């Protein structure tokens, strides 16, 4: 996996959800709750080595999680 700066991942995540920072915050929070409850990651990142927030942001940046998919998983 290519190492990317957090700023570029957040920028891509924002772009994927229409540049709505409030929505990004809520989406990251909801996904972190899922990951903390045992949900499998959708990206190749080990939750024991990476922060759950970083994993959630990468999933959103890569388009693997969006508001519709987060609702389905809750």
Curated annotation (Swiss-Prot):
Name of this protein: DNA-directed RNA polymerase subunit omega
Catalytic activity reported: RNA(n) + a ribonucleoside 5'-triphosphate = RNA(n+1) + diphosphate
Classification via Pfam families: RNA_pol_Rpb6
GO cellular component terms, A-Z: DNA-directed RNA polymerase complex
Family: Belongs to the RNA polymerase subunit omega family.
Known partners and oligomeric status: The RNAP catalytic core consists of 2 alpha, 1 beta/beta' and 1 omega subunit. When a sigma factor is associated with the core the holoenzyme is formed, which can initiate transcription.
Cited Gene3D superfamilies: 3.90.940.10
Gene: rpoZ
Chain's role: Promotes RNA polymerase assembly. Latches the N- and C-terminal regions of the beta' subunit thereby facilitating its interaction with the beta and alpha subunits.
GO molecular function: DNA binding; DNA-directed RNA polymerase activity
GO terms (BP aspect): DNA-templated transcription
Documented EC number(s): 2.7.7.6
Keyword line: DNA-directed RNA polymerase, Nucleotidyltransferase, Transcription, Transferase
